[in-house]
Amino acid sequence: MAKHERGLRFQPAGGVKTVQIPAGKKQRLTIERLSDDGRGIAFLEGKTWFVAGSLAGEEVEARVLNARGKVVEARTERVFTASTMRRAPACEYFGRCGGCSVQHVPHEEQLALKQRMLAEQLLRVANVVPDEWAAPLSGAELAYRRRARVAVRWDAKAKRLDVGFRAAASQDIVSIEHCPVLVQALQPIMNELPGMLKNFSKPQALGHVELFSGVATAVLLRHTAPLAEADLALLQAFCSKHGAQLWLHGEGEPQPVSPGDTLGYRLEPWNLQLAWRPGDFIQVNAAVNTAMIEQALQWLAPAKDERVMDLFCGLGNFALPLAGLAREVVAVEGVATMVERAAVNAMSNDLHNVQFFQADLSQPLTHADWAAEGFSTVLLDPPRDGAFEVVRQIRKTGARRLLYVSCNPATLARDTVELISQGYRLKRAGILDMFPQTAHVEAMALFEMSK
C-alpha cells in the first residue's frame, strides 16, 4: 500500500494529486447562498465550502473543520461584511456548541429557510407541489426544550470534569452552564449542574446526565460504576433543592431512587396524561407538539363512525386524541415496551376504543388480523428513515386519506413518489418548527385518494 504524505491525497497511478486543506486553517470567503442545513456556501479554487454561522452575501473568515476531496466544512470565526439579516445570537456558546446552528438568523427567516427546504425536496424528488401550503406551525424561539442530554467526561490527564454539550462537528465537550433553549424549569438545574458534579469524589464513574420536564421535573444520571454514598447524597440534596426526581442508570434499566416516582406529560386540550420512561421517544417541544396534534385532527377530521390506523404510534401521542373522535383507533408500533406503555396510557385515560399492537412495519400490513377490516384514514409518524415499506401497502388498507408526519423531508419526498404512483394526491403540506434555532425540519403532509 502506498504511503500517504500529510496534506496530500493521492489518486491511483496516472491520476492527479489533490492538495488537502488541513483542519484549523483559516480562509477568507464570500458566501454565495445558504445550503439546505442553514450553512453558508462559498466556492474557492475548485472546492465547495460549507460554512456554519454565515449568511448569503457575507465576507467571513472561516476555520476549517474537515476537508474531503472538493468539499470543505468550516465554521465562521470572524465576519468582515455582515448581512443585514444577521442578528446577535441569544447564547454565548453559539458557534462552539453543536446544539443550535442558526441563532444568527431571525426566526421568520429560519421558518422561510425550512419552508424552502421542504418545497425543494418535494419538487426535486417527487416533482410535486401541494395543492395548498399551510402556514408554519411554530412556538417560542427559546425556552422550548423539555428534554436534554448533558455530556459528562472525566479528563484523567488534566484532572478535569467537562460538563456541557457536544461541540459542532466534533466529539469534544463545550463546558456549558446556561442553555437558553431549555424550558424555564430546567434552567436553574442546568446552571448549577456542572458545579455540583465537580464535587463528586469519583467523577470517573459519571456517564451522562439527562434532564426532563413535564408532569414532574427529573434528573437522570448514567453511571459506569457504583456511586459512593457521599456522591449519592450530593445528588439527592441537589434534586431536593430543585424539586426534581432523581433517576439512576447503572446496569439494567433506569430506575427512580424513590420507587413511586413516574414521568409523564399532559395534552391539555384533550385532558390527557401520557406516562413514559427514560429511553422512550417523546417530542421535546411541548407547545409545537400540541399544535401539531390539533392540526392533524383538523386535517384528518375523522367522522364518528370511522376506523383510523396510527402507524409508528409510540406512546399514543396521536392515537389517544384521535380516539376521542373516531369509532375505533388501531395503533401500531415496533417497540414492544412502548406498545405496553401506550396501552396503559389508554386505560389510565379511560379510552376503550383504541387498541395497540406491536408489529414489524417493514412487513405486509394486510397479513395482520388487526388490518383485516381496513381503514378509511391512516396517520404515519415514522422515524428519519421514513416509511417506504408501509406506503407501498397503504392502498390495500382502503385508506382514502393519509396524514404523514415527517422528521426528514428527504424521505417524505421519496415516499411521496410512491403514494402518488398509487393514486394519492398531495392536498396540503407545511412545516412544523419543532426545533427553533436549528435547521432541522419537520413537516406534515395530507394525501387524499384521487377521484
UniProtKB/Swiss-Prot annotation:
Catalytic activity: uridine(1939) in 23S rRNA + S-adenosyl-L-methionine = 5-methyluridine(1939) in 23S rRNA + S-adenosyl-L-homocysteine + H(+)
Domain TRAM: 20-78
Signal peptide start-end: none
Documented EC number(s): 2.1.1.190
Family matches, as InterPro entries: 23S_rRNA_MeTrfase_RlmD, MeTrfase_TrmA_AS, MeTrfase_TrmA_CS, NA-bd_OB-fold, SAM-dependent_MTases_sf, TRAM_dom, U5_MeTrfase_fam
Residues reported in the UniProt entry to bind S-adenosyl-L-methionine: Q283, F312, N317, E333, D360, D381
GO terms under biological process: rRNA base methylation
Pfam families: TRAM, tRNA_U5-meth_tr
Key words, A-Z: 4Fe-4S, Iron, Iron-sulfur, Metal-binding, Methyltransferase, rRNA processing, S-adenosyl-L-methionine, Transferase
Record GO terms (molecular function): 4 iron, 4 sulfur cluster binding; iron ion binding; RNA binding; rRNA (uridine-C5-)-methyltransferase activity
Entry binding sites for [4Fe-4S] cluster: C91, C97, C100, C179
Active site, UniProt feature: C407 (nucleophile)
Transmembrane segments: none
SUPFAM superfamilies (alphabetical): Nucleic acid-binding proteins (SSF50249), S-adenosyl-L-methionine-dependent methyltransferases (SSF53335)
PANTHER family in the record: 23S RRNA (URACIL(1939)-C(5))-METHYLTRANSFERASE RLMD (PTHR11061:SF49), RNA M5U METHYLTRANSFERASE (PTHR11061)
Family according to the record: Belongs to the class I-like SAM-binding methyltransferase superfamily. RNA M5U methyltransferase family. RlmD subfamily.
Known role: Catalyzes the formation of 5-methyl-uridine at position 1939 (m5U1939) in 23S rRNA.
HAMAP family in the record: 23SrRNA_methyltr_RlmD (MF_01010)
Name this protein carries in UniProt: 23S rRNA (uracil(1939)-C(5))-methyltransferase RlmD
Taxonomic source organism: Pseudomonas savastanoi pv. phaseolicola (strain 1448A / Race 6) (Pseudomonas syringae pv. phaseolicola (strain 1448A / Race 6))
